C-alpha cells in the first residue's frame, strides 16, 4: 500500500511538472497549493507568483512553488543525526571560545604542517542515507550463504534466546555502557559478570575466573605467559599437544616470540620433560578432532616434573564431563561462544581463564569481586585493579584492556536462563546426536569411525574426504576436512535429527540407507567413559535456578539494567575513550542471520557479502589513515598495539636487524603501550614532556641517537593523552626514521584526526584504530572492541595471516611474509565490523571530517566554561585543546582534602559518569566529550562540575567539615536517603537534588561508595550463598 501511494504521488508530480512547461507565464516547474496528494509539509518553496493552471486542480488559484533540487534529495541523511551541534551553534560556541567560526578554531588547533587539504572517499563519498545504507547492507547480506556448520574447532551454532537477543544484545541500555570503573552506577553488569565468573568456576572446577578475554586462542596465549611468569622466566620451553585447535597453536607460537619462549608441538605420548626447561603444557579437552582423553595421569606426571598444565576446554562439554580442576589442571581456558552467542564469522565471543587462588595476581583481564559499601552492605567492584596495564605499565600481567563483557553477559544469561538441568539437557542432546551419527556410520560400513570416546565431534576415516565434503556441500552442509582421508563432524545445539539423516545419505556414498536416526537412537549408548562422567554439582546458586521462564528472565535483565548508567541516560566523558553515539542503523545488521550465522572457517565463497564489506572497509580505512594496507584481525585496541609492534619486529627481522629491540615511549602515550611493547620483547625507554605537555624533542633525539643501532620503534599517541597536538610531530617521526626506527602511532585519539590529518600523512608507519572509539562500535560495558592495524607499503607483507583460512593485508600486498596469527578468527570479530562500516559510509567524507571538528569544538567549549573554576593543565600553542583536556585537581587535595575520586562520586549525584581519573597525570580528571553530545548536555555537565567546585569552596572556607560533607559522602543512593536516621550535616534534598534538571529525571546509584581496599583484602570473585552476604554485612556494620 505504501509503495503504491509513493508511485501515485510520483506520477502526479511528474504530470504537474509536465503541465507547467506549456504555460509561458511560469519560468520554472511549480506545484499548486497543498492537495490531498502533496501536503503542506512538502519540501517545496513558494515563489509568491500567481499563475493560472490549464486545469484548476483544487478549485482556486495558487502560488507558484518552485522545486529545489536539494529538496528532492532523500531526507534521512545521517550526519545531522550524529553530529549534534547545528551550524548556528557551532559558530556561537566558537565565538565563546574566542574564534569567529569553527574553521578558525580548527586552524588554530591542528598544526598547519600536518593539515590535509581535504579527504575524499573512493566510495560513498557523499554518504549514504540511513535507508540507502540498510538497503546496501541487505544486498551484502544476500551474498552470504548460510550452510549448516559441522566444522567445530571452537565455533558452534547456537540458539540465542530471543529474550537475551532483544534485551541485551540489541539493547543500548546494555551495549552503550563503559567498563565498570564507577562501581556505584554499574552494579547491574557487575552482578551479571560475577554470574559469568561463577559459571566458569563451577564448570571448570577451579576457584578463580576473570570476567572474559578476547577469544580462546589468545586466552591460551595468556595462560602460556602465566606459566612463564609462574616459573619466573627460568624455563623457556612450552609444549602444545597436537590435539589443540590449529589457530590456538599458531597464536601461542606468535606470542612466544616476544617472551623468547620455545614452543614445541607434539603428540601427547611424545611429551618430554627431561630437559628440565619446560614451564608449561597445553592440552585440549575434548580434542580438536573430538577425542576424549583422561588426563589424570598425564597431569600427575607433568606436576612431578615441575610443569604447569593448561587445559583448553568447552563449557557445554563440562556440564557432563569431569571438570579440569578435578583432573588436576592448573589453568583452564576456553570460549563461552556456544552459550547463546552467534558465531558471527568469528566473533565477538567471550573467552575465559580460570585458575587457582595461588595465581590470582598473575591473571590477565578484568576480575569482578565482592566488597562492601560505606554503609557496610555488600557491593560489587572490579578487583585487583593495580594489576592493570595503565598502572603497572611494562610490568603488567597483560596488555589486555577491553575484553568481551557484553558477550560474557549474554553467556551468563544463557546459563541463568537454562540453569544446570537445562544446560545438561542441551549437552546430552548434542552428545546423543553425535552418538547416533557414529552408530549410523558403523551400520552403513562405508567409512570408519574413531574408537576413542567423544562428546560432540565424530572423527571419520574415509577413502576421499574431499568427495564426502563436496557431497555435503550439495546439501548446504560444511564438514571439516582434516586431511585427504580424515573428516570430522561436529554437532551443536541447532542440529536436528533430520540433519543426521541427511548426513547418513552424504556418507552412504550412493549406498541405500535403510534406517533413520530415530530408528537407531534407542540402541545408542553413552560414549563417555565412566571415569570422565561429571559427578560434581554446579550452578547451585539460586540465581541459576530462579529465572527459567521468559517473564522472570526479562524482569531480571531489566532489574540489572536499571542499576547501570549508560549513554541512554547522559554523556560519559571519559578521556581517551570516545563514548560517542552508537546509532541504531549501525547496529541493526549485527543480528541479521546472514551475518550472524556463518562459521569463521566456512568456505569464503559462502561469505561473499562479508568479503565485499572487508574490501570496502579496508579501502575506506586506508583513505582515512593514509596507509596502504589494513589487517582486520586484531580484536581489541591492545591486540592492535601488539600486532602493530609485531609487524615492526617482523620487518626488522626480515632485514637481518634482529638486534633492533629498543622502543621509545613518551609518558604522554596511551597507557597500554608499555605493556604491549614488553609483550614483544622490547626494551622500553621512556621520554618526558615539557611544561606544556609536549614530548621533549631534545630528550627524544638523545634517546634515539644513543640507541641508533638497536632502535626498533617509537610508540606515540596523537593527539597526545595530554590533550594537545604536538607541533613537532613530523620532526619527531623524522628523528626516529633517521635513526633506523619505525613509528607506531596509537589510534586511541583518532577522533581528533579523521579528515583533518592522518597517521600516514604525519609520518607514522603503522597505527591501530579503536573501532569501538572513533568508529562507533559500542563499548558494551567492557567490550567488544576492534583494533585493526594500518601500515605503509613496506610493512604490508608482514601483516598477520591464519592457519585455517589464509588472510593478509587489505588491499593485499604484492608479497606476503606474515608475522603469524594474532586472533583466533581470520578477520577478528567480523560480526561487529558492519557497525564501523555503516558509520563511515553514512557520514561521507565531509560528515566524518565535521565529526572531528565538532569533537574539538566541544572540548574547547567545555574547557573555556571550566577554566575559571579549575585549571586546565595543558593547551596547544594557540591556547586551545584537542578533543579532550585535563582538569587539574591536585591543589584541591591541599585546600580541601578532595581527590579526583571524590569529584567523580559526587558527579553520580548529578546524573553523570565521572571522567577518567588520575590518568595520564595523577590527581587530575581527563574529559572527552564527543561530537554527538549536544550543547545542552555539555552545559549540564559543566554546570555540575562548577556546582561541585562551589561545594569544594565551602570546605575551603571552613563552612563545612573536611571529612563529613556532601562530596565525601557521595554518592547518595535511595536507601541511604530514606533511612530512619539522617546524621549528615547537609539535607537529604541537597544530597539527592543538587541541580534543578534532576527534578525532571534522575539516575539513582544503587549503592553507597564502594570500599575498594576491603574488596581486595577479602577477595571473593564468585557468587556466595545469600546468607553469607547478610552475615558479612552484619559483621562489617
Swiss-Prot record:
GO terms for cellular component: apoplast; chloroplast envelope; glycine cleavage complex; mitochondrion. It is found in: Mitochondrion. Residues 1-66 form a transit peptide. InterPro entries: GcvP (IPR003437), GDC-P_C (IPR049316), GDC-P_N (IPR049315), GDC_P (IPR020581), PyrdxlP-dep_Trfase (IPR015424), PyrdxlP-dep_Trfase_major (IPR015421), PyrdxlP-dep_Trfase_small (IPR015422). Expressed in leaves, stems and roots. Gene3D superfamilies: Aspartate Aminotransferase, domain 1, Type I PLP-dependent aspartate aminotransferase-like (Major domain). GO terms for biological process: glycine decarboxylation via glycine cleavage system. It is an enzyme of class 1 (oxidoreductase). Its EC number is 1.4.4.2. The modification N6-(pyridoxal phosphate)lysine is found at residue 773. Its cofactor is pyridoxal 5'-phosphate. It catalyses: N(6)-[(R)-lipoyl]-L-lysyl-[glycine-cleavage complex H protein] + glycine + H(+) = N(6)-[(R)-S(8)-aminomethyldihydrolipoyl]-L-lysyl-[glycine-cleavage complex H protein] + CO2. The keyword Ligase does not apply. Its main location: mitochondrion. Pfam families: GcvP2_C (PF21478), GDC-P (PF02347). The glycine cleavage system catalyzes the degradation of glycine. The P protein binds the alpha-amino group of glycine through its pyridoxal phosphate cofactor; CO(2) is released and the remaining methylamine moiety is then transferred to the lipoamide cofactor of the H protein. Homodimer. The glycine cleavage system is composed of four proteins: P, T, L and H. This is Glycine dehydrogenase (decarboxylating) A, mitochondrial. The lineage of its organism: Eukaryota, Viridiplantae, Streptophyta, Embryophyta, Tracheophyta.
Amino acid at each position: 500500500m505504501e509503495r503504491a501511494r509513493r508511485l501515485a504521488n510520483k506520477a502526479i508530480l511528474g504530470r504537474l511538472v509536465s503541465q507547467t512547461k506549456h504555460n509561458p507565464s511560469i519560468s520554472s516547474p511549480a506545484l499548486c497549493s497543498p492537495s490531498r496528494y502533496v501536503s503542506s509539509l512538502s519540501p517545496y518553496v513558494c515563489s509568491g507568483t500567481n499563475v493560472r493552471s490549464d486545469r484548476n486542480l483544487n478549485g482556486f488559484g495558487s502560488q507558484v512553488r518552485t522545486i529545489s533540487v536539494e529538496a528532492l534529495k532523500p531526507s534521512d541523511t545521517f550526519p545531522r543525526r550524529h553530529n549534534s551541534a547545528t551550524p548556528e551553534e557551532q559558530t556561537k560556541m566558537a565565538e565563546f571560545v574566542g574564534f569567529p567560526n569553527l574553521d578558525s578554531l580548527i586552524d588554530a588547533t591542528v598544526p598547519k604542517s600536518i593539515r590535509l587539504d581535504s579527504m575524499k572517499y573512493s566510495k560513498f563519498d557523499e554518504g549514504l542515507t540511513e535507508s540507502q545504507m540498510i538497503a546496501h547492507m541487505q544486498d551484502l547480506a544476500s551474498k552470504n550463504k548460510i550452510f549448516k556448520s559441522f566444522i567445530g574447532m571452537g565455533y558452534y551454532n547456537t540458539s540465542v534466546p530471543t529474550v537475551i537477543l532483544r534485551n541485551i544484545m540489541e539493547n543500548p541500555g546494555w551495549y552503550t555502557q563503559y567498563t565498570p570503573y564507577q562501581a556505584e552506577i554499574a552494579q547491574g553488569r557487575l552482578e551479571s559478570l560475577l554470574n559469568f565468573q561463577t559459571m566458569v568456576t563451577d564448570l571448570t572446577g577451579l576457584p578463580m575466573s576473570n570476567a572474559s578475554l578476547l577469544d580462546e586462542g589468545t586466552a591460551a596465549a595468556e595462560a602460556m605467559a602465566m606459566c612463564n611468569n609462574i616459573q619466573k622466566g627460568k624455563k623457556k620451553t612450552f609444549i602444545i599437544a597436537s590435539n589443540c585447535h590449529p589457530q590456538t597453536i599458531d597464536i601461542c607460537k606468535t606470542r612466544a616470540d616476544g617472551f623468547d619462549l620455545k614452543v614445541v608441538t607434539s603428540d601427547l605420548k611424545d611429551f618430554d620433560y627431561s630437559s628440565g626447561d619446560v614451564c608449561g603444557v597445553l592440552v585440549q579437552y575434548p580434542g580438536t578432532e573430538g577425542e576424549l582423553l583422561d588426563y589424570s595421569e598425564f597431569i600427575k606426571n607433568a606436576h612431578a616434573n615441575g610443569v604447569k598444565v593448561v587445559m583448553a576446554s568447552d563449557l557445554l562439554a563440562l556440564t557432563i564431563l569431569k571438570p579440569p580442576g578435578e583432573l588436576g589442571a592448573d589453568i583452564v581456558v576456553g570460549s563461552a561462544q556456544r552459550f547463546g552467542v552467534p558465531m558471527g564469522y568469528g566473533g565477538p565471543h567471550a573467552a575465559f581463564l580460570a585458575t587457582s587462588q595461588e595465581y590470582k595476581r598473575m591473571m590477565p583481564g578484568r576480575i569482578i569481586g565482592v566488597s562492601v559499601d560505606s554503609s557496610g552492605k555488600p557491593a560489587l567492584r572490579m578487583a585487583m585493579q593495580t594489576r592493570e596495564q595503565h598502572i603497572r605499565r611494562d610490568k603488567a600481567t597483560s596488555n589486555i584492556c577491553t575484553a568481551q563483557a557484553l558477550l560474557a553477559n549474554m553467556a551468563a544469561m544463557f546459563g541463568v536462563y537454562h540453569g544446570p538441568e537445562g544446560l545438561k539437557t542441551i549437552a546430552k542432546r548434542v552428545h546423543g546426536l553425535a552418538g547416533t551419527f557414529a552408530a549410523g556410520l558403523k551400520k552403513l560400513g562405508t567409512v570408519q569411525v574413531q574408537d576413542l570416546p567423544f562428546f560432540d565431534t565424530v572423527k571419520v576415516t574415509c577413502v576421499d574426504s574431499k568427495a564426502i565434503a563436496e557431497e555435503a556441500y550439495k546439501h548446504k552442509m560444511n564438514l571439516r576436512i582434516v586431511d585427504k582421508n580424515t573428516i570430522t563432524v561436529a554437532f551443536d545445539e541447532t542440529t536436528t535429527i533430520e540433519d543426521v539423516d541427511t548426513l547418513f545419505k552424504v556418507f552412504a556414498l550412493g549406498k541405500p540407507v535403510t534406517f533413520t536416526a530415530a530408528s537407531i537412537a534407542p540402541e545408542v549408548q553413552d560414549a563417555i567413559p565412566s571415569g570422565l562422567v561429571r559427578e560434581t554439582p554446579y550452578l547451585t546458586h539460586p540465581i541459576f535456578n530462579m529465572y527459567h521462564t521468559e517473564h522472570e528472565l526479562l524482569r531480571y535483565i531489566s532489574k540489572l539494567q536499571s542499576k547501570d548508567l549508560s549513554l541512554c541516560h547522559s554523556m560519559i566523558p571519559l578521556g581517551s575513550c570516545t563514548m560517542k553515539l552508537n546509532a541504531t542503523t549501525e547496529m541493526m545488521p549485527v543480528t541479521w542471520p546472514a551475518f550472524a550465522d556463518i562459521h569463521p572457517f566456512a568456505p569464503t565463497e559462502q561469505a561473499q557479502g562479508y568479503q565485499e564489506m572487508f574490501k570496502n572497509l579496508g579501502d575506506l580505512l586506508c583513505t582515512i589513515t593514509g596507509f596502504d594496507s589494513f589487517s582486520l584481525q586484531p580484536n581489541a585496541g591492545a591486540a592492535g598495539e601488539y600486532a602493530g609492534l609485531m609487524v615492526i619486529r617482523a620487518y626488522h627481522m626480515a632485514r637481518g636487524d634482529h638486534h633492533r629491540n629498543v622502543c621509545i615511549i613518551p609518558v604522554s602515550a596511551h597507557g597500554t603501550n608499555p605493556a604491549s611493547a614488553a609483550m614483544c620483547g622490547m626494551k622500553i625507554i621512556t621520554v618526558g614532556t615539557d611544561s606544556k605537555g609536549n614530548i621533549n624533542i631534545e630528550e627524544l633525539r638523545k634517546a634515539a641517537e644513543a640507541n641508533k643501532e638497536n632502535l626498533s620503534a617509537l610508540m606515540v599517541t596523537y593527539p597526545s593523552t595530554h590533550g594537545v597536538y604536538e607541533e613537532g610531530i613530523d620532526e619527531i617521526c623524522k628523528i626516529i626514521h633517521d635513526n633506523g626506527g619505525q613509528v607506531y602511532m596509537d589510534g586511541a585519539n583518532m577522533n581528533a584526526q579523521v579528515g583533518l590529518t592522518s597517521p600516514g600523512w604525519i609520518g607514522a608507519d603503522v597505527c591501530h584504530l579503536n573501532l569501538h572509539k572513533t568508529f562507533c562500535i559500542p563499548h558494551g560495558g567492557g567490550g567488544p572492541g576492534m583494533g585493526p592495524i594500518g601500515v605503509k607499503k613496506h610493512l604490508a607483507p608482514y601483516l598477520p595471516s591464519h592457519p585455517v583460512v589464509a588472510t593478509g593485508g587489505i588491499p593485499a600486498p604484492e608479497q606476503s611474509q606474515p608475522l603469524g596469527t594474532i586472533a583466533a578468527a581470520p578477520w577478528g570479530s567480523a560480526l561487529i565490523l558492519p557497525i564501523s562500516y555503516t558509520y563511515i559510509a553514512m557520514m561521507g567524507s565531509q560528515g566524518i571530517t565535521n565529526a572531528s571538528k565538532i569533537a574539538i569544538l566541544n572540548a574547547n567549549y567545555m574547557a573555556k566554561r571550566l577554566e575559571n573554576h579549575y585549571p586546565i593543565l595543558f593547551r596547544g600553542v594557540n591556547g586551545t585543546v584537542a578533543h579532550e583536556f585535563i582538569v587539574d585537581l591536585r591543589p584541591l587535595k591541599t585546600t580541601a582534602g578532595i581527590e579526583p575520586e571524590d569529584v567523580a562520586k559526587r558527579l553520580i549525584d548529578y546524573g553523570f559518569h565521572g571522567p577518567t581519573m588520575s590518568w595520564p597525570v595523577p590527581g587530575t580528571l581527563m574529559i572527552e566529550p564527543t561530537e554527538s553530545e549536544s550543547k545542552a548536555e555539555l552545559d549540564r555537565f559543566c554546570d555540575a562540575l562548577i556546582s561541585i567546585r562551589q561545594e569544594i569552596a565551602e570546605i575551603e572556607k571552613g563552612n563545612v567539615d573536611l571529612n563529613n560533607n556532601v562530596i565525601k559522602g557521595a554518592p547518595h543512593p535511595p536507601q541511604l536517603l530514606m533511612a530512619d536516621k539522617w546524621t549528615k550535616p547537609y539535607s537529604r534534598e541537597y544530597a539527592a537534588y543538587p541541580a534543578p534538571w534532576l527534578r525532571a529525571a534522575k539516575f539513582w546509584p544503587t549503592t553507597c561508595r564502594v570500599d575498594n581496599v576491603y574488596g581486595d583484602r577479602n577477595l571473593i570473585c564468585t557468587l556466595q550463598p545469600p546468607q553469607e552476604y547478610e552475615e558479612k554485612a552484619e559483621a562489617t556494620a
